């Protein structure tokens, strides 16, 4: 891929995605296989007058070794220097950039029970810090084609060809055009206009139906609103958290969901794929589920904590979205969640509550926003998915027909 094009992508991530501010610290998380592109992003952050840019490198084989050889006690311990870093985030409110490129199968064979228990043990400590910075900082997740990820999508190609083809797909769906910034301004306006219409309906519940067996109803929080595209932090800074994005999303009412949903794409979770699964909800809670592939891992996900059994997000994405039109299954949630409609288990978003700026996080949760240590999207969109909105007064308004917008 031409370096001039990659430079435009790096600029898009730093300026439009994270919207790095003068004097702000930046923390970047990336895989070891992307040093050249990471350097471009770091350069763009400094051009935006970042105070300091720190890169935290990760490597899946090392994660597997840590889980294999360290005791559960040491894996479950948050050392003083790790807590100090979280306190630093609270004190300085840096922006965060996540450059994802990992192998979808990179953690196959790892002890999932050990990983889950260590995460559960550390979460109560991390949560205290995370709650203090909720909605205060900018963040952006964007993708870079790792070789093993690319080969997963295109096994028939040589590694270099597979990487190039994945680059093309990432850049196209991320709107890296002749003028990416203008393209994103137009895209954000379209998503904003759709959210405005949805919010004008005063929706009480959404009803989903598809020929694959999905028959599901979920309740809305009266004070909630649909959001999409860019967001504004509590510091007043506009940013785009996901590159790419195609969704209009809302956090539903905790405890109000009935019926069954069938996943239409595999879920990449903890370096493994969960496929062919369905989940049944009663009184908002996942009460029954099954996966043809990695059912045990699906169970670990749903049983991670009390909140992981409940929904944190309902996202509306047309089945003919640019990502779905590529014809690829990306084996990556950032892309696959923006290919079609999805739900998310776990944590809801406080910023979907109207006037959240003047409410505490606790206030938002009392209104019905779910709390959990996880937030995992799974795709339920299909070519014949219908969604109806039941609005105040009982009026029924079609939202989706044949998998796409009905308005």
Model-assigned labels for residue ranges:
Residues 1-258, 389, 395, 405-407:
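Active-site bordering "gate/hinge" segments
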Residues 11, 199-201, 270-272, 307, ...:
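Short solvent-exposed loop/turn micro-motifs enriched in small/polar/acidic residues
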Residues 205-208, 277, 287, 383-392:
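Short polybasic amphipathic segments
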Residues 219, 289-290, 400:
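Short linear motifs in exposed loops
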Residues 250-306:
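Long, well-ordered mid-to-C-terminal structural blocks that present hydrophobic/aromatic surfaces
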Residues 256-258, 274-276, 283, 309-313, ...:
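Active-site lining segments that contact anionic ligands and/or coordinate catalytic metals
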Residues 286-357:
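Dual-mode signal for accessory low-complexity, basic/Gly-rich regions
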Residues 362-407:
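Extended hydrophobic packing segments that form well-structured cores
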